[in-house]
């Protein structure tokens, strides 16, 4: 769990996301409050609940990116789900408790990866012994093994093929029984039981280089205590887990509508206990959701936040409105973030030996085209820049292997030549941009 101050968290988010200072402040305070709660003792710690957030703003302005970067920064178990994927219990589809089960799987993978690093040195030695067994046999003399060990460490045997016994994945089918929350669990647990009883392995023919990572991971997993790993993962979910619920506006029930709305309202009702705090059964054990942070987001083009069930509105106390992107924002998105679009394209074409140079007038022209198309067709925010950039650089990307060593300067004239006419023609833009 990170102990960054809210100011440091905002500063970190500024490296990747342009603008939206209100949203950044809200999530930075929410993250800092997780750390503050963990400093409390006893009963008070249990009583302090997270203040869940509702982000309201058009598509492509940074809602998902803020949540994703926040989770990365926190090193917390994080899952992004679309609210529209879920149905009310009793309907065909996934029930909302599956969100927590998936979050536990994410946490287990995270903890396992971290613990593997702790036993990396021992695992590498054990993997090396298995490779030597495959190369010279288990009964080879110490002198022979030492000779081959030196060659192995020098990389001289990387291309040599060996046969190794590796763990076979259980491959057990997973069944979802509609209307039965957690029905999937039984099938998975059964598969695990039979997998462990059989201890199945399979022989694979691999090069020494390819076998290295597989064998190191297997040996590391043997050194890990799986029960302790699961306990740590569940603890991480319960105290630091973050769930990002996208498209929450699509499950709003609007006045005077019926039919499919029934299931939508049911999804909202199913979400209530999850956000308020309940215990969810997973195949790894029970998980309490009281201290999981929920960040819901939606464009709310048609529905309004007040169309959500009043109880659900009450469980999302912090409201943040994200602004639509201006021309200046578009320009900044192209150049300011550490991994801006222009830097990405320069690096990609640099691998072919092509040097791309963007003039200031080209950046202005790209921003103008994106804003123009967003205003005439459909406003998809910063995502429009990707479409425009692809169109502008289409010819260069295609012919790059034949143009190695060239320096290509992109200016406003170049941009207008490739997308200017399309941007002016709304009918063409609708299909091409």
UniProtKB/Swiss-Prot annotation:
Which keywords are on file for this protein?
ATP-binding, Chaperone, Cytoplasm, Nucleotide-binding, Stress response
Query: SUPFAM superfamilies this protein is in?
Result: P-loop containing nucleoside triphosphate hydrolases
The source's domain of life comes to Bacteria
Instruction: State its role.
Output: ATPase subunit of a proteasome-like degradation complex; this subunit has chaperone activity. The binding of ATP and its subsequent hydrolysis by HslU are essential for unfolding of protein substrates subsequently hydrolyzed by HslV. HslU recognizes the N-terminal part of its protein substrates and unfolds these before they are guided to HslV for hydrolysis.
Pfam families, from UniProt? AAA (PF00004), AAA_2 (PF07724)
The entry assigns this protein to a family as follows: Belongs to the ClpX chaperone family. HslU subfamily.
Which cellular components does GO assign to this protein? Answer: HslUV protease complex
Instruction: Quote the NCBIfam families the UniProt record gives.
Output: hslU, PRK05201.1
Keyword Disulfide bond part of the UniProt annotation: no
Q: What is this protein called?
A: ATP-dependent protease ATPase subunit HslU
Checking InterPro entries in the record gives:
AAA+_ATPase (IPR003593), ATP-dep_Clp_protease_ClpX (IPR050052), ATPase_AAA_core (IPR003959), Clp_ATPase_C (IPR019489), HslU (IPR004491), P-loop_NTPase (IPR027417)
Q: Its GO biological process terms?
A: protein unfolding; proteolysis involved in protein catabolic process
Q: State the taxonomy lineage.
A: Bacteria, Pseudomonadati, Pseudomonadota, Alphaproteobacteria, Hyphomicrobiales
Gene that encodes it: hslU
């Amino acid at each position: 769990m990170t102990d960054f101050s809210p100011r440091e968290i905002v500063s970190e988010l500024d490296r990747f996301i342009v603008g939206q200072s209100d949203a950044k402040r809200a999530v930075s305070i929410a993250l800092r409050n997780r750390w503050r709660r963990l400093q409390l003792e006893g009963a008070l710690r249990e009583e302090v609940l997270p203040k869940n957030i509702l982000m309201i703003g058009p598509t492509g302005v940074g809602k998902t990116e803020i949540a994703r970067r926040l989770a990365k920064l926190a090193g917390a178990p994080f899952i992004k789900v679309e609210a529209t994927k879920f149905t009310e219990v009793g309907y065909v589809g996934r029930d909302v408790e599956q969100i927590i089960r998936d979050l536990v799987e994410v946490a287990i993978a995270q903890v396992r990866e971290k613990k593997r690093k702790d036993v990396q040195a021992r695992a590498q030695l054990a993997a090396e012994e298995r490779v030597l067994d495959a190369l010279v046999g288990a009964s080879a003399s110490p002198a022979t093994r030492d000779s081959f060990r030196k060659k192995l460490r020098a990389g001289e045997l990387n291309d040599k093929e060996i046969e190794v016994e590796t763990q076979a994945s259980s491959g057990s089918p997973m069944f979802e029984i509609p209307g039965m929350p957690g029905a999937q669990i039984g099938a998975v647990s059964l598969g695990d039981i039979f997998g462990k009883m059989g201890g199945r392995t399979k022989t694979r023919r691999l090069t020494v280089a390819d076998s290295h990572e597989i064998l190191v991971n297997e040996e590391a997993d043997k050194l890990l205590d799986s029960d302790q790993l699961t306990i740590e993962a569940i603890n991480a979910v319960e105290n630091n887990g973050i769930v990002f619920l996208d498209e929450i506006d699509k499950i709003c029930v609007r006045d005077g509508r019926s039919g499919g709305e029934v299931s939508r309202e049911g999804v909202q009702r199913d979400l209530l206990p999850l956000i308020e705090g309940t215990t969810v059964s997973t195949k790894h054990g029970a998980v309490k959701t009281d201290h999981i942070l929920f960040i819901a987001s939606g464009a709310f083009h048609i529905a309004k936040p007040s169309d959500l069930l009043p109880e659900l509105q009450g469980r999302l106390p912090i409201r943040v409105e994200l602004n639509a992107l201006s021309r200046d924002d578009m320009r900044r998105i192209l150049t300011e973030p550490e991994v801006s679009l222009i830097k990405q394209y320069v690096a990609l074409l640099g691998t072919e030996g092509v040097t791309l140079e963007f003039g200031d007038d080209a950046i202005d022209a790209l921003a103008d085209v994106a804003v123009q198309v967003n205003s005439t067709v459909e406003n998809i925010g910063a995502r429009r820049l990707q479409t425009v950039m692809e169109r502008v650089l289409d010819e260069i990307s295609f012919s790059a292997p034949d143009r190695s060593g060239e320096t290509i300067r992109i200016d406003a004239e170049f941009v207008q030549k490739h997308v200017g006419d399309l941007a002016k023609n709304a009918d063409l833009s609708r299909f091409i941009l």
